[in-house]
């Protein structure tokens, strides 16, 4: 048809990565209309909906995180719904998930904390588990003091063992 508009899209080239970036940044920027547009544009262009579902789940964990734990459930449920229904019905679940993520409260604190811990562990030496935190399934381990002086948090006021240490020796509490 002469009046048909040509869409700019490629399944793995620059247009693909530009559009997935626009989708992710629209969610991060709390713009549901733009997020839904980019998702729909990619689906219309032939993007693998399973790839998009995976990216939507990642957005929930990376950009919304603990600010709205329900977002992670919705993203996972949308991916599972797509797997169960396929296209085109399952695409609605992906669209609704994108809208929810875009309007959800945002926090990348968990993402940043995990990356900082990962970087620290990679450069740090291997530290021993403190004796009071060690498992003591045998008599010998108990005799060696494994688990001795561990304070069971549920037996403490407000289920909090104030002053108990959980990090390896030599590591300062944050």
Question: Model features per residue range: what roles?
Answer:
Residues 1:
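Extracellular and organelle-lumenal recognition/adhesion modules and their flexible linkers in secreted
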Residues 5-41, 54:
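Conserved helicase/translocase motor-coupling segment
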């Amino acid at each position: 048809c002469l009046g048909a508009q040509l869409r700019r899209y490629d399944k793995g080239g620059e247009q693909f990565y530009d559009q997935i970036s626009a989708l992710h940044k629209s969610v991060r920027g709390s713009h549901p209309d733009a997020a839904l547009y980019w998702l729909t544009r990619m689906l219309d262009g032939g993007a693998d909906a399973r790839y998009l579902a995976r990216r939507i789940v990642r957005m929930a964990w990376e950009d919304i995180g603990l600010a709205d734990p329900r977002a992670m459930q919705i993203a996972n449920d949308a991916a599972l719904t797509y797997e169960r229904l396929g296209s085109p019905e399952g695409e609605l679940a992906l669209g609704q998930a994108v809208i929810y993520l875009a309007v959800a409260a945002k926090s990348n604190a968990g993402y940043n904390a995990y990356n900082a811990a990962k970087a620290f562990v990679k450069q740090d030496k291997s530290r021993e588990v403190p004796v009071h935190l060690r498992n003591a399934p045998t008599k010998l381990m108990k005799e060696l003091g494994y688990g001795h002086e561990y304070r069971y948090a549920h037996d403490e006021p407000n289920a909090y063992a104030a002053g108990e240490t959980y990090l390896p020796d030599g590591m300062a509490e944050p």
